[in-house]
Design a protein with these regions (language model features):
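Generic beta-strand or strand-like secondary-structure segments
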Residues: 65, 69, 82, 96-103
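Active-site beta-loop-alpha junctions enriched in small/polar residues
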Residues: 21-23, 54-56, 82-86, 118-121
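Active-site mouth loops of central-metabolism enzymes
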Residues: 22-34, 83-98
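Non-cysteine beta-strand/loop elements that form the S-adenosyl-L-methionine
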Residues: 19, 78-81, 110, 115-116
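Glycine/proline-rich, positively charged
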Residues: 88-121
């Protein structure tokens, strides 16, 4: 799998990433957790080290599954998460962003987030 530098970061990410919207099961058929973990493992085995998710995917379910997957390998996998749509009263204040980041860290089981994107802002 080819890798590229991610902007001005020190991250080397795979040219193909794993989009984790569906494992959150907002719409369509719910993906069982074991199937989601198998899919993430298959992607990692193929060289994918970049996962894209959001706090709103399955009301945090996607982040929780990814958190389970990256335990013990979080230095190998780069996770990009999005925030800004989980509540209808979202604002882009420091407090709101800090709270959303803290909740994402908790679901992912990490101390800090690799990459944060503001969702539909």
């Amino acid at each position: 799998m080819n890798k590229r530098s991610l902007g001005s970061t020190n991250f080397e990410v795979s040219e193909i990433g794993f989009g984790a919207w569906q494992i959150g099961a907002d719409w369509g058929v719910e993906v069982p957790t074991d199937t989601a973990l198998e899919s993430l493992s298959a992607a990692a085995d193929a060289g994918v080290n970049f996962i894209d998710t959001a706090d709103v995917y399955g009301a945090g379910r996607s982040e929780k599954i990814i958190g389970e997957f990256i335990q013990g390998r979080d230095d190998e996998i780069i996770v990009a998460t999005k925030m800004g749509r989980a509540t209808s009263d979202w604002n882009d204040s420091y407090d709101e962003i800090s709270k959303a980041a803290e909740l994402s860290c908790k679901r992912l089981g990490v101390e800090s987030l690799d990459l944060v994107q503001l969702h539909c802002i």
